[in-house]
Amino acid sequence: MTQYDVVIAGGAMAGATLALALSHLTDNQLKVAVVEPYQVDTSHPGFDSRSIALSYGTVDILRRFQLWPSIAPCATPITDIHVSDRSHLAMTDISAQQVGVDALGYVVELADVGRIYQSLLQRCESISLYTPAAVDRVERFTDSVSVHLNNGETLQAKLLVAADGAVSNCCQQLGMNLAQHDFEQIAVIANVVTEQAHRGRAFERFTEHGPVALLPMSDNRMSLVWCLPPDLAEQVMLLSDEQFLERLQQEFGWRLGQMQKVGMRASYPLILRHREQNISHRFAVVGNAAQTLHPIAGQGFNLGIRDVASLAEEITKQLDDVGAYSSLMRFKQRRCGDRQNTIWMTTSLVHLFSNDYLALRVARNLGLVMMDNLSGLKQPLLRQTLGLVSR
């Protein structure tokens, strides 16, 4: 049985960020184990690489943990965000220049960040990486937790952290209740190329079927997230590339000129999942294991990184017992407001912008017009978009 201070189940962005943050904040004083079922694929997926958007606040967190310098060279800045409603004049724009920042956020490819984090984890003397391996069974005692892996090894620690995704095996084993709401939408994702260069612009276009988002990537690609009812999503997935681009053109419009190329498509159901409790005895939950949101406002991953930052800070306040109940309660209290507010905001946006009822159509267009002309109404949206929220 190998002894650690913290065992983290899940070595993707949330889990790896937590491990590296603990290393930085404690100057390698804590022994940390990261258990990850999947080894990083060293081959790059090329044109079809999947990506995520990091908010300004998330980048600030990564800077403080000394992680951003490694990620920055492969990040594409978002300098403008354009929000509009199809077939109506209402729109609002947010620009980095107006806000007084270099970028509103950045888009990074998961393949790039995965390789960077893998290298950082392997070079860190206080972190042990178990991969491919998964948590098979968890036993909790008064002062410790035993984590049994599917490769036969057993790890003992003061704290187990679940960062193992939306359908968290650790949370299921420990009976952490999961609340779910099916949005009855499917996200169709792909990378596309448009006639006009994106120039760092991100777009969110609301339609009667659901939102269409385009995020700027390297090599003038754009990352598409197209939210549709299940029947329409099935139709769209069966279209030829040419037909797909024509349908997308109809929904998005000509703001970027002609849609010229689309890569491999994928789809997944959009379901709100959130744990009612994010702590238990010797146990904490972060990232998608704590909550998985609709992508309408790009908040899910950034909310998870705020989980990670708050937990890392609380752990390092009590190094003699990193899994102490007092530390976990402080973490829970810090995260409560942000979690509730972000979940409420995201869900409200889905219901407001994903249908064509006349009353809601008028309301959302009026809202976009008012936000574009009244800075007082725009500020709350701006702060949430930038990730500048209390945690």
Positions of predicted regions on the chain:
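Beta1/beta-strand and adjacent pyrophosphate-binding region of the FAD-binding site
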Residues: 1-12, 33
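Conserved FAD-binding catalytic core of PHBH/FMO-like flavoproteins
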Residues: 62, 160-258, 262-265
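N-terminal FAD cofactor-binding segment of flavoenzymes
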Residues: 46-86
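FAD/FMN-dependent oxidoreductases across multiple families
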Residues: 234, 238-325
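C-terminal helical "tail/cap" subdomain of flavin- and related membrane-associated enzymes
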Residues: 313-391
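Glycine-rich FAD pyrophosphate-binding loop
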Residues: 23-48
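Conserved N-terminal helical subregion
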Residues: 74-173, 181-186
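N-terminal Rossmann-fold NAD(P) dinucleotide-binding loop
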Residues: 15
